[in-house]
Amino acid sequence: KLFQNYRFIGVLWFGLSLVAVLQTAFRPEKHNNYLIFKGVFWHTIQQLPLYVPYPEEYFDMNHYGIFFSGIIAPFAVLPNWLGCSLWILANSAFLYWAVRQLPLPKCAVIGVLFISAHDLYTAATMQQFNISIIALLLGAFVFIEKGKSHWATLFIVIGLLTKLYGIVGLAFFFFAKDKWRFVWSGLLW
């Protein structure tokens, strides 16, 4: 019965996301990744180098580019506790949406969500953008399956411009029904 009920998996999925929020967003020492992401936005605005250490702001190095500053912008302008909370919830919601779009039977989609829930929780407690990278790749796959290469390539380009992992999406070229449209729309984006 659990694998036939979106309500149960939705409560579990977003419940774990809320636990991650409570464990990290209100404890400044626990949201270092969010501070790195926020730094990308503010350093871009201030035209500062993105790939140098900022030990007074956070305790690691940034690996994200200028494009990412646009993604994090709505969260970066908020107080840390609120921006971090909404960042975690937005990433979780995006992945939930992407998995729900998969062309699988309902019980299989729920199974994927159930199996992925632990990894979601782990990544959410670290405020990782990898949650959305996976959502972008799943979304690209779904759009390829629907014959909408232009939307698939948008997801791939966003993934590629934010984190190099997005390059994996280029493998979907081989599954595209209209390969020329895939190439041209990818170049246009």
List each language-model region with its residue ranges.
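TM-lumen/periplasm interface segments of multi-pass membrane proteins
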Residues: L2-V99, P103, T122
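Residue-level signature of the transmembrane alpha-helical core
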Residues: I88-L89, V112-I115, G139-A140, L154-L161, ...
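Perimembrane helix-loop-helix junctions
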Residues: I167-W189
